[in-house]
Every structure is written in C-alpha cells, then in structure tokens.
Amino acid sequence: MDFSLSEEQELLASSARSLAADLFGESVARQVLDGDRARADKGWSQLQEAGLASLLVADEHGGGGGSLLDACLVTTELYSALAPVPYLTSAVAVPLLAAGSGKDATAVLTAVADGATYGLFVGADLSWPSAGPDAVCLDWIPGRDGLLVGPDALELGPAEGAPGVDPLHPLGRRIGVGGSSWSAPDLAAGSRRAVAGVRVAAAAALTGCLAGAAQLAWDYIATREQYGKPIAAFQAVRHMAADLLVDLEICRSVSLGAAWQVENEPIEDAERIAAVAKSWCGEAAVRSIETSIQLLGGIGVTWESTAHLYLRTAHQLAASFGGTRSLLRRVGADFIAARGGHSDGSS
C-alpha cells in the first residue's frame, strides 16, 4: 500500500504553504496582538477567494469537495505560519458538522461556500448536545455568530469576548439565544464521524504549531555561536534538535494517517483513532515546543520571540475538542468494554 501523498495533495500543501507565508507570519500576528486585525481579515478573505476556506464543502453546495486529509494539509501550513484566522472552526469543523447533520443543513454549507465565517460553540469535552448557555465559542470574531450544535438542530447565536490563553484564536461566550436555526434530525447519527474529523484536524493544527516552533529553534542553533562555533555543533544540542524532528514527523504521520482512516474506517475505529491522534499530537506538540524554547535560550522566554505564540496556541488546542486525559480514558473504557468488562491485569 502506498501511503505517500498524491501529486495533487503535494501541490495543495505547497500552495497553502506559499500562500500562508505571503499572507501571515510574525508581522501579522504581532498586529493582532496589538488589536489590529486588518491584515488578518484581508488574509482570511484571500483564503476564501482561493477556495481553501470552503475546501470541505461539497461541490453541490458551491465548495471544493475536498477530503479531510486535504483540509489537514492546509490546516498544518496555516498554523505553522501563525495565521490568526478561524480555519479550524469555520472551514473545517463547521462544514464537517453541518454535513453530518443531514440535508437540512444546506443553508450553513452554502453560506460557508459563499464566504460566511462562523465561530464554533462547544461544551465540555466536545459534548455537542450539552453546549448550552455557558458554551465556549472557539475562534470568536467580534460581530460574527457562532454555530451551536444541539441534539437535533443547528443554531447560529451571538457571543462576546472571553478570556483565553491564545490571542490569535480568541474565545467567546454565548450571550442569550437567537439567530437562525435549522432542524437536523440526523445529527446524532452523523455527528460522531464529524467530531472524529474535527479532532483529527486539531491534531493537524498542533502539528503545524510544532513545525513552526521547531523551525525557529533549528534556524537559531545554526547561527548562534558559542566558543567560536555554532551551538548546533554541540552533541547535547543536536540531540534535542533531533528529538524535535522525531516528534514532528510522528505528528505529521499520525494526523494525516488518522485523517484517511476517519473517513474510511468503521465509526468505532474512526472515533478511537481520532482520540489517540489528538491525544498524541497534543502532548507531543506542547512538549516539543517547550524544547524549542529551551534551545532558543534566554530569547525564547521573551515577548519579542514568537515561540510563546506557538506554545499558547498549542495549549489551547490541546485542551479543545477533548483533553488528552478524557480522550484516553474513553479509549481505555471502550477497550475494557470490548473485552467484556474484564482485565487480566497485564499491561
């Protein structure tokens, strides 16, 4: 079996990488930190014009008809470039959940294809039916509604800003009710695979954070000199840099492999694979970004370094869509249940 990317997927990733480098990066991220979203919003509009924001919307609704793997490739490149845009929510999670809810969600899908932007309301541990008045809105943008997924309906509702750890992807809190709503009687059946897809996309975003932070560290140790030579010449530093590469390549393989499996495997396997992928990438990304900061030395812990932006985004992603402990606890419970509720005590 050939696990390599197709020529079209290689081209998609390359195009997304080039576009992200042109539209975003440290200067745009710094402007957002200062409260100026003009360039970030312009970049988001250009992603929409390029068709990347509607990649997961089916052809019949005006989108690109892409796969989850395609969306994960783009997600990784955008997060590596510190893109302060709602790609993971508006371009990935919302289309997946709307498509999984049945034919009555056509209005949401068509709106995304036409350029509408939504945040995403989630309850604790991604428990969509319980995402009530206290639900957190991910990727909150002032003046934009968030999509709330209920037991048998989709609803757009307003939100206001809320404290969060990641300034590039701010949080909101729901304020009252209102907005459009759509009946979605098939939501319970379709949302399981959609939620699995969202978790895999989050794993791809974490991979992007790790890629960006690792590149910062590699560039630094190649040029920073001590005792008359680059610090990359010292064995201890080389080992740390190599560990970054190992974690990065594993995260990349895990997220992309899981993307294919979630779309093609039975739902029980898809949910387990997505949970493990999200858990692994969450822990690996945070751990390795912290290693990147250590390689950067004193500058790595300053406001002037961009390393803290990658770390803050990674922490928020790791806690979103199900934290590591809750996901692995669920995987373990399912494993025990499959064995008849018994354990032989072996590890």
Q: Which residues does each PLM region occupy?
A:
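Alpha-helical interface subdomain recognition
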Residues: 1-79, 199-347
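Amphipathic alpha-helical regulatory segments at dimerization interfaces
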Residues: 22, 46, 96-99, 111
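Short N-terminal amphipathic alpha-helices
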Residues: 55-59, 83-90
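Short alpha-helical interface patches
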Residues: 62, 75-78, 89, 185-192
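N-terminal glycine-rich flavin-associated loop
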Residues: 85-102
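FAD-binding core of flavoproteins
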Residues: 85-86, 103-215, 219, 345-347
